[in-house]
Amino acid sequence: MAKIVWDESGKRFYETGVKNGVLYVQDESGNYPKGVAWNGLTAVTESPSGAEATELYADDMKYLEIRSAETFGATIEAYTYPEEFEACDGSAAIANGVNAGQQDRKPFGLCYRTVVGNDVQGNALGYKLHLIYGAVASPSEKAYSTINDSPEAITFSWEVTTTPVNLDGFKPTACITIDSTKVEPGKLAELEKKLFGDTSTEAQLPLPNEIKAMFAEE
């Protein structure tokens, strides 16, 4: 039996950053066929909720505990957003350059990348890809103010709820995370080709079952 050792060199891990955001507007079939870059992404706060305990009693004692379903939400913050996101934010074009608000909000998917680092390699150790499915953005305020001697760009913010999608052998999920330090590089490259596209293929967001099959052990 090995003795526990704390804070070994190379095992002091951390996570930081957010970049390489990609928006995928969901189509009528529930797929995410065309991704576009989300420039100016500054923060994504993942906010799972639910899984609340209900205690059941019998024979004058605690009998068991059951938990409610868990849901996944998030907050997205950015200095700007892709034009394609306007349909996800309740806006519809009635003419070129003219939009009407308070319209139906299209569901969307999102991909973004965060850094995985340690005490030896720093931020170069690796990264995680975060994939979100079935997201719907809630209305949010936009606070415009006069330009002064300390100008600041507006930071847009959206609260997001999700509807999970099927994952064979597991409960439905709205989020998938891929750790570059643990998966096979070739399979990761195959996934990134789908997520980000190349000169011959459009970027698209594969569904969880496709990702499961892609990374299945041979």
Please describe what each predicted stretch is.
Residues 62-140:
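Structured, beta-strand-rich domain cores
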Residues 139-142, 146-218:
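Mixed-charge, glycine-accented linear interaction segment located at domain edges/termini
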Residues 43-50, 132:
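Membrane-targeting and insertion segments and their boundary/processing signals
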Residues 46-48, 56-57, 61-85, 150-165:
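Oligomerization/assembly interface segments of phage tail-like spikes and tubes
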Residues 14-24, 31-35, 124-131, 169-177:
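Short, well-ordered strand-loop elements centered on a beta-strand within folded domains, enriched
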Residues 2-9, 23-28, 88-94, 114-118, ...:
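Short, charge-rich amphipathic segments
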Residues 1-46:
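Polar/acidic, low-complexity leader/linker segments enriched in S/T/G and N/D
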